[in-house]
Amino acid sequence: MKISIIGTGRVGSSTAFALINAAVADEIVLYDLNKEMAEGEALDLLHATTFHKRMIIRAGEYSDIEGSDIVLITAGAAQKPGETRLDLTIKNAKIIKGISENIKKYAPNTLIINITNPVDVMSYVVWKVTGFESNRVIGTGTILDTARLRALIGKNCGVSPMSVHAYIIGEHGDSELAAWSSAMIGGVPIKGFCRNCPYKDNCNKDLSKIFDDVKNSAYTIISKKGATNYGIASATTALVESIIKNEGRVYTPSVLLDDVYIGYPAVINKDGVERTIDITLNDEETEKFESSKSIIKEYLESIKNLL
């Protein structure tokens, strides 16, 4: 299994390290415009393989991604404190277009996972420029947001996050929403669980506050350390594992719906996106989801001259 990573900044290098720990690849190729950084990361990561599965780790050129089973895109301008993901659109669209052209040239049969923000818009750019089938172009979408939601619900309600089934859908950004109508804890609708929870009298957070914490997580982290990297690296690795092992896990990646890439529940297997799963949304949630789609489409309109 050969995986290539385009971009070896914090996210790219953290993802490479997570992939090593997961032992899912036989070869990892790192590419970056800063060749010395890519070479340094490759050497450092190679040393880490001493304690894990034996694999090839090397820096390379675009031509070295040939034969890749999966290509991960992490390159792009960094999100600055106070800057929304959609503010990055024009800046990163040109970068992603060039990367996509090279992937199409050197690895036409690969499956692409885009991590670069704004992830929904950039995933659409990758899809349009490469001309690949939509199941082979996946964005990380709201996978990490969903994980954050489940973790915070679990902490607040005194249960394991693994027993929480709740989704963040829509844009990976300011217009995302929590699909509370379909949220469950241990098979019980979450609002029913809350009514019968023995800790309800001492609970100091309602559902909207939990969602606000999820929505602001990235901004909080960026304001304190400058970037988010470990969470998204783990989310990407989980996505890769479901593809490589053909596990059919359900995540909320950025997938093609109504000619727009957007975070939505989907089954992920060896072919990428096998299918989406329709979840129950009330009228308010449906309206918010459609609004989120419209926002992404507006930003796509702003870069249509590049595609």
UniProtKB/Swiss-Prot annotation:
EC code(s) of this entry: 1.1.1.27
Annotated positions binding beta-D-fructose 1,6-bisphosphate: 150, 165
Intrachain disulfide bonds: none
Gene Ontology MF terms: L-lactate dehydrogenase activity
Protein location: Cytoplasm
Residues the entry annotates as binding NAD(+): 11, 32, 62, 76-77, 115-117, 140
Subunit structure, as described in the record: Homotetramer.
Protein name (record): L-lactate dehydrogenase
